[in-house]
A protein has these predicted regions:
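A short helix->beta-strand "capping" segment at the edge of beta-propeller domains
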Residues: 11-26, 56, 200-201
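Blade/loop signatures of beta-propeller domains
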Residues: 4-17, 36-37, 46, 139, ...
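Short, solvent-exposed loop/turn segments at conserved positions within beta-propeller repeat blades
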Residues: 44-45, 84-85, 131-142, 181-184, ...
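Short loop/turn segments immediately following beta-strands, especially the blade-tip
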Residues: 189-196, 274-280
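Beta-propeller fold detector
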Residues: 19-20, 59-63, 99-103, 156-159, ...
Length: 282
């Protein structure tokens, strides 16, 4: 990976030295860094959640993951997972107990939850598109962006015929960002105190490639996995591209200082050191 343009006028990322930290998987996705010092990521066809601790070999975090894709941690260190095969959202506590948080909307099964983020106050947001054979078994006639409240109530933030994919929050937790793989854009939603999203708008259009997962740094810049990792400002200005050896699916900031960007890309996971810290909600 080589960053082709600086992320901001005051920083130069023209020389980066990527490191392949895990490989020989089928299709990696859903990286999420735990404050306990390790990265969790999914191997979707392998039906596993993996755990990578720097300096150690990757290990199985959870076998038979029900087609896990996106992952996110909360303030209590619990792991939230989008299970595409079982079509549900689960939460795994630090003892390994798995709890189902969402699997239906108005009595109908979700399509196939894809990506998820948890705000500092515990509000949960996730995308629910349908790809491939999932489209043939759908019970809902739309793809959605959902919100789960503190009380476990599920609301639809947005409905569409096209497919939302990656999801992330601004550093202050007041803006929700969602990529759309069909429209090749990123939509932004202003969030209120209760987690609702009253103001929807297109922030970024005509992304090079098919946008997938995304993350945000502490300055509010967006890192979008597409043909490469495309970097945009919070205002939607394209700032640069992190060239990838394989097509990236997602990314996450990690390491104790949150200045490493972990990128899942096909069979492997890569790590790139940056001069900016990632924004995390936990």
């Amino acid at each position: 990976m080589i960053l082709l343009a600086p992320v901001s006028s005051s920083e130069d990322f023209s020389e980066l030295h990527p490191q392949k930290v895990a490989t020989n998987y089928v299709f990696t996705e859903g990286p999420a860094w735990s404050r306990d010092g390790y990265l969790v990521f999914s191997d979707i066809p392998g039906n596993k959640l993996l755990k990578f601790t720097p300096g150690e070999q990757p290990a199985i975090f959870r076998d038979n993951s029900n087609g896990a894709i996106g992952n996110s941690f909360d303030m209590q260190g619990r792991l939230y997972t989008c299970e595409s095969h079982s079509r549900r959202i689960t939460r795994t506590d630090k003892k390994g107990k798995v709890e189902v948080l969402a699997e239906r909307w108005q009595g109908k099964r979700l399509n196939a939850p894809n990506d998820i983020v948890v705000r500092r106050d515990g509000q949960i947001y996730f995308t629910d598109p349908a790809f491939g054979s999932q489209q043939d078994t759908r019970e809902l006639d739309f793809c959605g962006v959902y919100h789960i409240s503190h009380r476990g109530e599920i609301d639809v933030i947005a409905k569409s015929k096209t497919r939302p994919n990656g999801i992330a929050l601004s550093p202050n937790g007041k803006i929700l960002y969602v990529t759309n793989s069909d429209e090749r854009n990123v939509r932004a939603y202003d969030l209120d105190r209760n987690g609702g999203a009253p103001n929807e708008r297109v922030l970024i259009s005509n992304i090079a490639g098919i946008p997938d997962g995304l993350k945000v740094d502490e300055s509010g810049n967006l890192y979008i996995a597409a043909n490469q990792v495309e970097v945009y400002s919070a205002e939607g200005q394209h700032l640069g591209s992190i060239r990838s050896y394989d097509t990236p699916s997602n990314c996450a900031f990690g390491d104790p200082d949150f200045q490493s960007l972990y990128v899942t890309a096909r069979t492997s996971v890569y790590r790139v050191r940056l001069n900016v810290k990632g924004s995390v909600q936990y």
